[in-house]
């Protein structure tokens, strides 16, 4: 297949390298020093077993419009980055192109091909103006849940931390020729990609962890095992999960594991920093609304109260605002320091910083 991976970051890099290695024609969309490194030396993946895999001739660009029509488009950017891509996405489509979104949280397409009274409902927290929903035909979409953990450790280099599960599901639950073909391609590349009859149930199972551990870790600067072993934060996680479970149940979703088992699974991961904590520490915009705000929205929609989720959401939104303000001040301070240093050394004290 011709495959385009939008966002060659940690997860995008993980799938791009192994799909290319298994014989598919893969193009990645990347930016900055990461793109420059991929163009120069290819995209390198270090798996959790220490083995190294490199796609030396990986096609890479920062312009979606140059990639051309694809058989499969893997959307491996954060939920809050999708809307900015919708104008250019159609340049990647031919009539049979499949779009495989890999976002965490409640996706924009959740109620598309859903059936029932909520068919076509727009999740405004993740798609405020319904631009994404209106731009992408739901018939193109196959759902996917991302379980692996990975990180970019240097430009052009992705380290896989753990996991290889990418469950797939048609939005209407059907087992089609196209989803079988994609699942087979993922399996041949070394991933575990079962075809699920209800991908939304799997989304909620993954979201249980993202909803709770991500914001709590960002607020406390703690790892998964820290949160799970501290009695108060473990109890908070349990209460947030119970609220989410009540919402999902109202939407017809049943969980195949208990809350205690889900927390125990997170505890076993150990000293792992969640992506939200990593974003906060790196000064990047954290992914909050798709993971937390969307659940509150669905709580309002279904009539389920979410007091614990509401409180954590308010705190982490303020944290985001505070970090953004601090980063702005830091950038201004850095510029002032640089200008002062340059004035001290240049004739006439003129500034060379713009």
How would you label these PLM feature ranges?
Residues 44-47, 116-119, 158-162, 211-213, ...:
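Short, hinge-like loop/turn segments at secondary-structure boundaries
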Residues 226, 234-354:
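NAD(P)-dependent Rossmann-like dehydrogenase/reductase catalytic/cofactor-binding core
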Residues 53-56, 61-153:
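Rossmann-like NAD(P)(H) cofactor-binding subdomain of soluble oxidoreductases
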Residues 1-48, 352:
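NAD(P)+-binding Rossmann beta1-loop-alpha1 motif at the extreme N-terminus of oxidoreductases
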Residues 92, 133-206, 212, 218-256:
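Internal alpha-helical scaffold of NAD(P)-dependent oxidoreductase catalytic cores
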Residues 28, 59-60, 168:
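Generic preference for hydrophobic
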Residues 1, 71, 164:
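Nucleotide donor/acceptor-binding cores
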């Amino acid at each position: 297949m011709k495959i385009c991976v939008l966002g060659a970051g940690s997860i995008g890099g993980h799938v791009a390298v192994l799909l290319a290695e298994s014989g598919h024609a893969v193009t990645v969309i990347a930016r900055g020093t990461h793109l420059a490194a991929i163009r120069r030396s290819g995209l390198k993946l270090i798996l959790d077993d220490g083995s190294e895999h490199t796609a030396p001739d990986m096609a890479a660009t920062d312009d979606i419009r140059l990639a051309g029509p694809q058989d499969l488009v893997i959307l491996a950017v954060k939920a809050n980055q999708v809307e900015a891509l919708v104008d250019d996405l159609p340049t990647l489509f031919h009539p049979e192109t499949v779009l495989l979104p890999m976002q965490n949280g409640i996706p924009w397409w959740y109620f598309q091909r859903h059936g029932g009274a909520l068919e076509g409902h727009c999740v405004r927290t993740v798609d405020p103006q319904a631009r994404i929903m209106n731009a992408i035909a739901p018939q193109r979409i196959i759902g996917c849940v991302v379980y692996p953990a990975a990180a970019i450790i240097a430009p052009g280099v992705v380290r896989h931390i753990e996991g290889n599960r990418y469950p797939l599901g048609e939005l209407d639950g059907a087992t089609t020729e196209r989803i079988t073909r994609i699942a087979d391609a993922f399996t041949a590349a070394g991933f575990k990609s079962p075809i699920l009859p209800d991908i939304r149930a799997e989304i909620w199972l993954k979201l249980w962890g993202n909803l709770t551990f991500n914001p709590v870790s960002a607020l406390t600067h703690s790892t998964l095992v820290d949160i799970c072993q501290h009695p108060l934060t473990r109890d908070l996680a349990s209460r947030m999960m119970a609220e989410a479970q009540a919402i999902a149940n109202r939407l017809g979703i049943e969980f195949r594991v208990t809350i205690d088992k889900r927390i125990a699974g997170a505890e076993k991961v150990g000293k792992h920093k969640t992506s939200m904590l990593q974003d906060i520490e790196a000064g990047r915009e954290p992914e909050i609304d798709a993971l937390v705000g969307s659940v509150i929205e669905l709580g309002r929609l279904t009539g389920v109260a979410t007091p614990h989720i509401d409180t954590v959401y308010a705190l982490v939104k303020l944290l985001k605002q505070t970090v953004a303000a601090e980063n702005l001040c830091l950038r201004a301070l850095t510029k002032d320091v640089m200008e002062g240093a340059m004035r001290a050394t240049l004739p006439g004290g003129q500034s060379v910083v713009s």
